[in-house]
Design a protein with these regions (language model features):
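Second-shell loop/turn segments in exported
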Residues: 1-2, 18-27, 90, 119-128, ...
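Active-site-adjacent substrate-binding region
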Residues: 144, 149, 295-396
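Noncatalytic luminal/extracellular "stalk/propeptide" segments of secretory-pathway proteins
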Residues: 2-6, 10-118
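Soluble metallo-hydrolase cores and metallopeptidase-like ectodomains found primarily
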Residues: 65-100, 156-230, 242-249, 253-255
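Extracytoplasmic/secreted proteins, especially bacterial periplasmic and envelope-associated proteins
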Residues: 7-10, 14, 31, 35-38, ...
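Solvent-exposed loop/turn segments at secondary-structure junctions
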Residues: 54-55, 113-115, 150-154, 211, ...
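Structural recognition of the beta-strand scaffold that forms the well-ordered cores
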Residues: 106-109, 144-147, 204, 215-218, ...
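Acidic/histidine-rich catalytic neighborhood of metal-dependent amide-processing enzymes
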Residues: 165, 199-202, 223-313, 327, ...
Length: 396
């Protein structure tokens, strides 16, 4: 029988290695969902598939030229196609955007406007500032939008939104610097992309219990378009599959649900589909895994909407794992959808890996089997603590 560490890293190598990028609507996303389904059925879980419509998008070629020199540029996910030669209008603040004549030109955003990626219009955490930036751009109708990437390493796109109507792409820092310094009279941009209706699916496996109450262990399996997504989040999926195999032969008093969500990296499509049928009043707690297991990272644990009793229980288990730390609550993953509905939520994540997230560097060889084992073992101890509890025990 394989050791737990070998099982965990095997799942990561399959998802982030053989399959690779798994953004919604892609063949990789479909292949990953099928792999997870097969693994859950092999373990003996009762499996439910929850499909959601989503955009299926692909990019063939991206060209940016200035003064007959070809420059690096990265098309933004879900961008419509464009081919245009036009002058460039730089803007670094909302005030500059408000006063700029952008019609038919190429807007080059930098500085305060690109200090962070702009959230999709439908994202529940979108800010008024982001909404203002989107509204100004769509009203002023530039031919395309270029965003200067703020950091040297972090692989963030300026926009990632199928509802954003303008062609857009993101510039590496050195290219943005060159364009702003030289201010060429015209630049040529060509984005060859295709967008059509597609679908993605949650894969839900269950171990039925004697009671209707449920513990949910969840992890998203989709990725951003730019990464094989080992730490974000093949490792999380590996953990829930390994825990499913461990507990499948020993049913608990409550039902245990293993939810592999898809749609997290664009919009919470997966968790929204889940909540169309899920009943918050029946869920004892949710345990989410997103970002644990990197060699250069530290495994983290936190809680949202949880009682003091649940938090004390989780922290007492954590105390036996000196390589992991308790952190302040963070909302940027699927556990927040449970917490917002009053369901106690525990979240496993990773600290110290920001620059790896969503980048081509998030590969399977960066994952530590020992750190995955650490997170899985701690989660198993917490699950054993929770499985006989009543729903009320963990509520705030």
């Amino acid at each position: 029988m394989l050791e737990l560490s070998e099982v965990l890293i095997g799942h990561v190598r399959e998802l982030a290695g053989r399959i690779g990028t798994r953004y919604i609507g892609s063949t990789g996303n479909t292949a990953a969902g099928e792999y997870i389904r097969r693994e859950m059925e092999r373990i003996g879980l009762a499996v439910e598939i929850q499909e959601s419509p989503c955009p299926a998008w692909s990019a063939r070629r991206t060209i940016l030229e200035a003064e007959e020199i070809q420059l690096r540029v990265y098309v933004d996910p879900f961008s419509p196609p464009v081919e245009v030669t036009a002058s460039m209008v730089p803007a670094c603040t909302i005030a500059e955007l408000e006063h700029a004549d952008l019609s038919g030109k190429i807007a080059l955003l930098y500085g305060d406007l690109t200090s962070a990626p702009v959230s999709p219009k439908q994202w529940f955490l979108i800010t008024e500032r982001e909404q203002q930036i989107i509204a100004l751009l769509e009203r002023k109708r530039p031919a395309a939008v270029l965003s200067a990437r703020p950091g040297v390493s972090y692989f963030g796109h300026g926009f990632c939104d199928a509802d954003f109507s303008l062609p857009s792409a993101t510039l590496p820092r050195d290219v943005a610097l060159a364009l702003l310094r030289k201010n060429p009279s015209a630049v040529h941009l060509r984005l060859e992309t295709e967008r059509r209706p597609g679908s993605t699916a949650n894969v839900i496996g269950r171990i039925p219990g004697k009671r209707a109450e449920t513990i949910v262990l969840c992890a998203h399996y989709d990725t951003a378009t730019t990464t094989p997504g080992a730490c974000d989040n093949a490792g999380g999926v590996a953990i829930i599959l390994a825990l499913a195999a461990r507990f499948a032969s020993r049913p608990a008093a409550c039902t245990i649900e293993f939810a592999a969500f898809s749609g997290h990296e664009y919009l919470p499509l997966g968790v929204d589909a889940y909540w169309k049928t899920a009943k918050a009043e029946k869920i004892i707690a949710a345990v989410n895994f997103d970002g644990a297991g990197h060699i250069l990272g530290t495994n983290t644990l936190t809680a949202m909407a949880a009682s003091d009793k649940l938090i004390r229980a989780a922290r007492s288990k954590l105390a036996a794992y000196p390589g992991a730390v308790w952190v302040e609550p963070w909302p940027e993953s699927d556990h927040s959808a449970f917490a917002m509905r009053g369901v106690p939520a525990l979240a496993f994540g990773g600290a110290g890996i920001r620059e790896i997230t969503h980048s081509p560097a998030d590969t399977a060889d960066g994952i530590s089997p020992l750190k995955l084992n650490e997170a899985a073992s701690l989660a198993a101890e917490i699950l054993l603590e929770l499985k006989d509890k009543k729903v009320e025990w963990g509520r705030e």
